[in-house]
């Protein structure tokens, strides 16, 4: 049986390249989400534009899993780099995903852990391996590691320092991956996060997030398309 791949991006810019590659796509619009159900390079794909933030991502991921039944999920798009080895346009691949803005430590949970859930959501090892292989083949610099999510665009030294204190090995931050991972965990669907860096903490730049975003979308989409060929 041929596999079907779910792909999730938050913003129109993050899914546009992939959407333009799709054929035989039908569009599902529901609850502020858009799902494009079709094919890319003869691989069955369901592409979700979820909207920004963890609630939108959770709604969209649930709809994607229930309505299109993908065998696995790839979360793509942009992220802010916190690992010193990451620069704009580089690729970050999840080895674990956590909420950085959840705190139930008063009841004995780890920082970022929600009750009835693991402290960290672990991606599928095969998907991580495929992502790393295709990133290397494409010649991109890549870091694999912890990706932390929260409903905040992280900038400013104080916020960055707090996240690093709570999660010393954090590689990148963004606003949806932990919600997507939590829904995939609940539905027992394998996932991986493959994003490109749009802005880098602690490094001065005259370029804004908006100027970085097209490059991040291009690079992350290139890796996702290469990954799809492994499941055709």
UniProtKB/Swiss-Prot annotation:
<dbReference type="InterPro" id="IPR010049">
    <property type="entry name" value="MTA_SAH_Nsdase"/>
</dbReference>
<dbReference type="GO" id="GO:0019509">
    <property type="term" value="P:L-methionine salvage from methylthioadenosine"/>
</dbReference>
<feature type="active site" description="Proton donor">
    <location>
        <position position="199"/>
    </location>
</feature>
<feature type="binding site">
    <location>
        <position position="80"/>
    </location>
    <ligand>
        <name>substrate</name>
    </ligand>
</feature>
<comment type="pathway">
    <text>Amino-acid biosynthesis; L-methionine biosynthesis via salvage pathway; S-methyl-5-thio-alpha-D-ribose 1-phosphate from S-methyl-5'-thioadenosine (hydrolase route): step 1/2.</text>
</comment>
<keyword id="KW-0378">Hydrolase</keyword>
<dbReference type="GO" id="GO:0008930">
    <property type="term" value="F:methylthioadenosine nucleosidase activity"/>
</dbReference>
<dbReference type="GO" id="GO:0008782">
    <property type="term" value="F:adenosylhomocysteine nucleosidase activity"/>
</dbReference>
<dbReference type="GO" id="GO:0019284">
    <property type="term" value="P:L-methionine salvage from S-adenosylmethionine"/>
</dbReference>
<feature type="binding site">
    <location>
        <position position="154"/>
    </location>
    <ligand>
        <name>substrate</name>
    </ligand>
</feature>
<keyword id="KW-0486">Methionine biosynthesis</keyword>
<comment type="function">
    <text>Catalyzes the irreversible cleavage of the glycosidic bond in both 5'-methylthioadenosine (MTA) and S-adenosylhomocysteine (SAH/AdoHcy) to adenine and the corresponding thioribose, 5'-methylthioribose and S-ribosylhomocysteine, respectively. Also cleaves 5'-deoxyadenosine, a toxic by-product of radical S-adenosylmethionine (SAM) enzymes, into 5-deoxyribose and adenine.</text>
</comment>
<comment type="similarity">
    <text>Belongs to the PNP/UDP phosphorylase family. MtnN subfamily.</text>
</comment>
<dbReference type="GO" id="GO:0009164">
    <property type="term" value="P:nucleoside catabolic process"/>
</dbReference>
<dbReference type="InterPro" id="IPR035994">
    <property type="entry name" value="Nucleoside_phosphorylase_sf"/>
</dbReference>
<feature type="active site" description="Proton acceptor">
    <location>
        <position position="14"/>
    </location>
</feature>
<keyword id="KW-0028">Amino-acid biosynthesis</keyword>
<protein>
    <recommendedName>
        <fullName>5'-methylthioadenosine/S-adenosylhomocysteine nucleosidase</fullName>
        <ecNumber>3.2.2.9</ecNumber>
    </recommendedName>
</protein>
<feature type="binding site">
    <location>
        <begin position="175"/>
        <end position="176"/>
    </location>
    <ligand>
        <name>substrate</name>
    </ligand>
</feature>
<dbReference type="InterPro" id="IPR000845">
    <property type="entry name" value="Nucleoside_phosphorylase_d"/>
</dbReference>
<dbReference type="GO" id="GO:0005829">
    <property type="term" value="C:cytosol"/>
</dbReference>
<dbReference type="Pfam" id="PF01048">
    <property type="entry name" value="PNP_UDP_1"/>
</dbReference>
């Amino acid at each position: 049986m041929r596999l079907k791949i779910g792909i999730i991006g938050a913003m129109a810019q993050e899914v546009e390249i992939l959407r333009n590659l799709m054929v035989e796509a039908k569009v599902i619009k529901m609850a502020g989400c858009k799902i494009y159900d079709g094919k890319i390079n003869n691989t069955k794909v369901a592409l979700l534009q979820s909207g920004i933030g963890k609630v939108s991502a959770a709604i969209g991921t649930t709809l994607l899993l229930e309505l299109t039944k993908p065998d696995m999920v790839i979360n793509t798009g942009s992220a802010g780099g916190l690992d010193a080895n990451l620069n704009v346009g580089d690729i970050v691949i999840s080895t674990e995903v956590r909420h950085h803005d959840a705190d139930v430590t008063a009841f004995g949970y780890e920082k970022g852990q929600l009750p009835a859930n693991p402290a960290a959501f672990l991606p599928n090892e095969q998907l991580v391996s495929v992502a790393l292989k295709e990133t290397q083949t494409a010649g991109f610099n890549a870091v694999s590691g912890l990706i932390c999510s929260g409903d905040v665009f992280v900038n400013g030294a104080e916020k960055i320092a707090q996240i690093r204190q709570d999660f010393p090995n954090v590689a990148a931050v963004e606003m949806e991956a932990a919600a997507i991972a939590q829904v995939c965990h609940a539905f027992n669907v394998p996932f991986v996060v493959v994003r490109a860096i749009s802005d880098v903490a602690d490094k001065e730049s005259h370029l804004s997030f908006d100027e970085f975003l097209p490059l991040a979308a291009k690079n992350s989409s290139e890796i996702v398309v290469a990954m799809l060929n492994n499941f055709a």
